[in-house]
Amino acid sequence: MAPITTSRVEFDEIPTVVGIFSAFGLVFTVSLFAWICCQRRSAKSNKTPPYKFVHVLKGVDIYPENLSSKKKFGGDDKSEAKRKAALPNLSLHLDLEKRDLNGNFPKTNPKAGSSSDLENVTPKLFPETEKEAVSPESLKSSTSLTSEEKQEKLGTLFLSLEYNFEKKAFVVNIKEAQGLPAMDEQSMTSDPYIKMTILPEKKHKVKTRVLRKTLDPVFDETFTFYGVPYPHIQELSLHFTVLSFDRFSRDDVIGEVLVPLSGIELSDGKMLMTREIIKRNAKKSSGRGELLVSLCYQSTTNTLTVVVLKARHLPKSDVSGLSDPYVKVNLYHAKKRISKKKTHVKKCTPNAVFNELFVFDIPCESLEEISVEFLVLDSERGSRNEVIGRLVLGATAEGSGGGHWKEICDFPRRQIAKWHMLCDG
């Protein structure tokens, strides 16, 4: 039998070919990865993030954002100083240097005081070369006042609006409020602050700082929203709520202002506005809405099962639109709260569906001293939530709440569901 012979040269060539192909594959993979990274970086630099937010407090940027702004050298600073010196002094209605410790102003002739500090509060990104346009329509109130509201003056809000086309930035400056009513009866003053919401999205809710013991607060705070297309501004509205801070209870609502942006032209420069603060309209609905709940008492385990099912016909909390409701459930024993639960928040709806179940342990077999409180609240990010309506079920509860509780006690181990009208919280 002849011996089998193989060529060693063929086996030596195989590793060489594999190595060459591996090297080419590695180079191709690295090149592809580098190209993808470059494409992502260039796309990210060219894309403007929508609704980026910057807050400026009296000319100081407390939420800085790097927007690839170039550094200014000595020559640029000098030229900018000369340009600002060449600008004429603008006559304004108040003098910031004449404020007292509470932020109040002396009663003087409005034409006598002048200051340029009030207008020069925008960031350096916005050169003040545009003309300031004051629209005659902006000096009118956003809502016609009734005879009752005219008798009860709630003050005036001063603000300015501006749009920067280069940065696609919408700038709102809350300047001051004058003539606010006193919410503290002892000191005859208020601790005011302002909340602002952009409608109809309600995604951006901002607020100013609290100014202590003043009825004429000067906030001078600038809120800048980046990535807002100019045509989109015509579809928006600004809702301002003027409140007085209360350390021990819910903040007092002084009033509100609604500024629709449709028809307002910001292409000519900054626009100054004054709006009368009107009373918050709480009579937008005939009632506070209804709540559907189901309860079951288990006598063998001394537990109470509570199911929050639905809510309907919930009123608007204010002119900012629909509420963001959720339900808070409190269990009381002898007028002492022993347990609490809450549902998830349902966004922008007057008819919410919850379908959430909670189980409470009852400390004793008798239900005479047990009561269940349902609070329907409007979720407000960054501030205290407002109570839309309230419902109480218990032995001493009035109306449908007492009847529902009696059925629960008479028929244990049975899930009993009923609709209830909500009352004021």
UniProtKB/Swiss-Prot annotation:
Polar residues composition-biased segments: 105-119
Any one GO molecular function term: calcium-dependent phospholipid binding
How would you describe this protein's topology in the membrane?
Answer: Single-pass membrane protein
Mind telling me which residue stretches traverse the membrane in this protein?
A: 17-37
Q: Which residues lie on this side of the membrane: Vesicular?
A: 1-16
Q: Which UniProt keywords apply?
A: Calcium, Cytoplasmic vesicle, Differentiation, Membrane, Metal-binding, Phosphoprotein, Repeat, Transmembrane, Transmembrane helix
GO cellular component assignments: astrocyte projection; axon; dendrite; dense core granule; exocytic vesicle; glutamatergic synapse; Golgi apparatus; membrane
Q: Where, in residue ranges, is this chain on the Cytoplasmic side?
A: 38-425
Explain what induces or represses this protein's expression: Up-regulated by potassium depolarization, calcium ionophore, ATP and forskolin in culture cells. Up-regulated by kainate in the hippocampus and piriform cortex.
- Tell me how the protein is altered or processed after translation: Phosphorylation at Ser-135 by MAPK8/JNK1 reduces interaction with KIF1A and neuronal dense core vesicles mobility.
The SS bond pairs are none
Entry's Gene Ontology BP terms: calcium-dependent activation of synaptic vesicle fusion; calcium-ion regulated exocytosis; cell differentiation; dense core granule cytoskeletal transport; memory; negative regulation of calcium ion-dependent exocytosis; negative regulation of catecholamine secretion; negative regulation of dense core granule exocytosis
Modification sites for Phosphoserine? S135
Task: Name its cellular compartments.
Answer: Cytoplasmic vesicle, Secretory vesicle, Neuronal dense core vesicle membrane
Task: List residues binding Ca(2+).
Answer: D246, S249, D252
How would you summarize where this protein is expressed among tissues? Widely expressed. Expressed in the brain. Expressed in pituitary gland, cerebellum, cortex, hypothalamus and hippocampus.
Give start-end positions of Low complexity composition bias. 137-146
Q: Does the keyword Phosphoprotein apply?
A: yes
**Has UniProt tagged this entry with the keyword Transmembrane?**
yes
Which positions fall inside the C2 domain? 153-274, 287-420
User: Which cofactors are reported in the record for this sequence?
Assistant: Ca(2+)
Q: How does it assemble?
A: Interacts with KIF1A; the interaction increases in presence of calcium and decreases when SYT4 is phosphorylated at Ser-135.
Similarity field: Belongs to the synaptotagmin family.
The entry's free-text remark on domains says: Unlike in other synaptotagmin family members, the first C2 domain/C2A does not bind Ca(2+) neither mediates Ca(2+)-dependent phospholipid binding. An aspartate-to-serine substitution in this domain inactivates Ca(2+)/phospho-lipid binding.
Q: What does this protein do?
A: Synaptotagmin family member which does not bind Ca(2+). Involved in neuronal dense core vesicles (DCVs) mobility through its interaction with KIF1A. Upon increased neuronal activity, phosphorylation by MAPK8/JNK1 destabilizes the interaction with KIF1A and captures DCVs to synapses. Plays a role in dendrite formation by melanocytes.
What's the protein called, per UniProt?
A: Synaptotagmin-4
Q: Which organism is it from?
A: Rattus norvegicus (Rat)
